[in-house]
Amino acid sequence: MNELDSLVTSARESFARSATPAELENAKAQFLGKSGRLTELMKGMAQLSPEEKKTRGAAINVAKQAVEAALAARRQELADAELQAQLKAEALDVTLPGRQRGRGGLHPVSLTLERIERIFGSMGFEVADGPEIETDWFNFTALNTPEDHPARSMHDTFYVEGGTPEAPNLLRTHTSPMQVRYAVQHVKKHRGLIDAGQAMPEIRVIAPGRTYRVDSDATHSPMFHQCEGLWIGENVSFKDLKVVFTDFCKTFFESDDLVLRFRPSFFPFTEPSAEIDIQFQSGPLAGKWLEVAGSGQVHPNVVRNMGLDPERFIGFAFGMGPDRLTMLRYGVNDLRLFFDGDIRFLSQFQ
């Protein structure tokens, strides 16, 4: 074996011993670097004759090509080995069971709202929807709220841009404006029957949704939910209110021994007005009177603002807080827990 064959064999063995790309580069420098063995052989050709240079140069080039081929082959082997190691590390066992996603669910207040809509829907009530940014007229004036009523102050109501000093816009403080909007459209639709003295289809509607007031403590939130109800016809009485709301409460709380109490109260939009309390006969709240709603016979001025004659049409309205009903149903004492977004708490109600 001559000198060049020995050099090629030595290079191949050195490359084969290189276990990493860095070691391979060091081995390459020993043979192909500026001071490598092949480079030194080429420098030594300077003392040779032209004929010897030709023969010697051709032999050195053949050896160099063999070394470079061995180097390229080893580089590919190391790259393949690195790829296989990476694939092995990232390999997926398709026989393993998949990771199950946690099951989501409705918010407890949403569950309550659906329950309310379902119960009143079974009684023939429709569901109304409307804007959360309301006009002063629909939120206060149409509901017989005096200009100097405390509820109109900035301490109780969130006013927003877009209105005028005479007709400001605000975040609705209750969902009663939706009742008025619904009633106005209902009256327009059946105006021909009304003017002809014929019977108009009764207005039976509930208006659930978000409302806003400047208030925040354990039992109040700046944003809270309300559900208002309205039933207007020619022969609707306070007795109907008592029957409807009693049936609702017994169905909602799934309790036949529930007792309701109507306490005289005052609201600008109803006359007479009453607070509605309930009393459980069993369970942790047994014997306690708990306020759940306000109610009353719709004030003649409100009936008139709906486009109806209060001498002919009469009805009742009620308003309750789904948030409070949710607290009572699930035994939660702090309203803010429902809106903190803690999945650990909310997941208990699924």
Curated annotation (Swiss-Prot):
<dbReference type="GO" id="GO:0006432">
    <property type="term" value="P:phenylalanyl-tRNA aminoacylation"/>
</dbReference>
<feature type="binding site">
    <location>
        <position position="271"/>
    </location>
    <ligand>
        <name>Mg(2+)</name>
    </ligand>
</feature>
<dbReference type="Pfam" id="PF02912">
    <property type="entry name" value="Phe_tRNA-synt_N"/>
</dbReference>
<dbReference type="GO" id="GO:0000049">
    <property type="term" value="F:tRNA binding"/>
</dbReference>
<comment type="subunit">
    <text>Tetramer of two alpha and two beta subunits.</text>
</comment>
<dbReference type="Pfam" id="PF01409">
    <property type="entry name" value="tRNA-synt_2d"/>
</dbReference>
<dbReference type="GO" id="GO:0005524">
    <property type="term" value="F:ATP binding"/>
</dbReference>
<keyword id="KW-0479">Metal-binding</keyword>
<dbReference type="InterPro" id="IPR004188">
    <property type="entry name" value="Phe-tRNA_ligase_II_N"/>
</dbReference>
<comment type="similarity">
    <text>Belongs to the class-II aminoacyl-tRNA synthetase family. Phe-tRNA synthetase alpha subunit type 1 subfamily.</text>
</comment>
<dbReference type="InterPro" id="IPR006195">
    <property type="entry name" value="aa-tRNA-synth_II"/>
</dbReference>
<keyword id="KW-0030">Aminoacyl-tRNA synthetase</keyword>
<dbReference type="GO" id="GO:0005737">
    <property type="term" value="C:cytoplasm"/>
</dbReference>
<protein>
    <recommendedName>
        <fullName>Phenylalanine--tRNA ligase alpha subunit</fullName>
        <ecNumber>6.1.1.20</ecNumber>
    </recommendedName>
</protein>
<dbReference type="GO" id="GO:0004826">
    <property type="term" value="F:phenylalanine-tRNA ligase activity"/>
</dbReference>
<dbReference type="InterPro" id="IPR022911">
    <property type="entry name" value="Phe_tRNA_ligase_alpha1_bac"/>
</dbReference>
<keyword id="KW-0436">Ligase</keyword>
<keyword id="KW-0963">Cytoplasm</keyword>
<dbReference type="InterPro" id="IPR004529">
    <property type="entry name" value="Phe-tRNA-synth_IIc_asu"/>
</dbReference>
<dbReference type="InterPro" id="IPR010978">
    <property type="entry name" value="tRNA-bd_arm"/>
</dbReference>
<dbReference type="GO" id="GO:0000287">
    <property type="term" value="F:magnesium ion binding"/>
</dbReference>
<keyword id="KW-0648">Protein biosynthesis</keyword>
<dbReference type="InterPro" id="IPR002319">
    <property type="entry name" value="Phenylalanyl-tRNA_Synthase"/>
</dbReference>
<dbReference type="InterPro" id="IPR045864">
    <property type="entry name" value="aa-tRNA-synth_II/BPL/LPL"/>
</dbReference>
<keyword id="KW-0067">ATP-binding</keyword>
<keyword id="KW-0460">Magnesium</keyword>
<keyword id="KW-0547">Nucleotide-binding</keyword>
